[in-house]
Each structure stands twice: as C-alpha cells, then as structure tokens.
Amino acid sequence: AVLCIVLGMGMPTVGVYILLAILIAPSLVEVGVSPLAAHMFILYLGMMSLITPPVAVAAFFAASIAKAPPMATGWTCMRFGWTAYVVPFLFVFSPSLLLQGTPGDLIIDVSSAIAGVWLVSAGMIGYFARHLDIFGRAAFLTAGILLLIPSELGSWAIWTDWVGWIMGAGVVYWDVS
C-alpha cells in the first residue's frame, strides 16, 4: 500500500496505473488477490498520492488558491479522505464490493461498508445528531471499525458484523434520543 502511494507521487493517472500494473499487481495476484481487486487496489492507492503529503499535488494547489499553509492542507486532506485509504483494502478482502459474489454477499458487504464508514466518520468528526463527548466518539468509532472488518477473514469476522450492527444501532439511538 505504501509503495503504491510512493510510486504514484507526482504522476498522472494513466502513468500511475501503468507503472503499478507492471510492478505491483502481479505480486498481489500471485498471493491470491483476484486480478480485478488487485488492479482496483493499485489504482486507488496510487491516486492517493494526490492528497498524501509530502507531495500532495492536489492539496498544495488547493492551499495556494485558499492562501493556506500547504502541509497543513495536505494533512487535512488526508484526514477528510480517510475512507479513500480504507476502501482499497475492502476491495481486496470483500470481492463482493466489486460485484464478485452472490447477491446476498453484496447486500451484506455493501451495507456493512456504508454503515461502517458512516459511523467512523461521525466518531472522527465528533458530531452525529449532537456533539459527541470522548465516550460517544469511541463508541461510534468502535462500532464502525467492527462493521468494516471484512467477513471473508474467517468465521469469527461474521460476529464482528453482528456486534457492529447492534452497537451501531445502540449508539445511534443513544445519540438521537
């Protein structure tokens, strides 16, 4: 993952994809990742160099327009774009997110991923229906992370989805009421 980000720094999309498809994708396929997931993984993470300091070309352009400090803008971009760093791993470990699998798996994995991202984002920001204290943030983060653990990792991972759904419903109900 780090190698994809480093090799993608300062390059256009097509160049990043060609370079990473030659250097990184074959290794991922060799260890058992499906070819589609491997190529989505490298493309997605290769483009994350646009918002990842120290290069963060897109963030630095935005900083110059806003007359803001470039590195601070880069770190803020990373914080706001945290899902973009997680999604490629979800592609690798949950192929149903790339429409490879049964419709039941697709529904379960997509709904868990959406709810997990939603809960983690609320926990990171510190606001849902109202301002969250440190315990509320921790509860939202924990529920979201449990939902983001792919069920394909093993039979134990299915239980993390159940616990994440129950905990997520509980913290949302607690915050809304």
List each language-model region with its residue ranges.
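Alpha-helical transmembrane segments of multi-pass membrane transport proteins
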Residues: 1-177
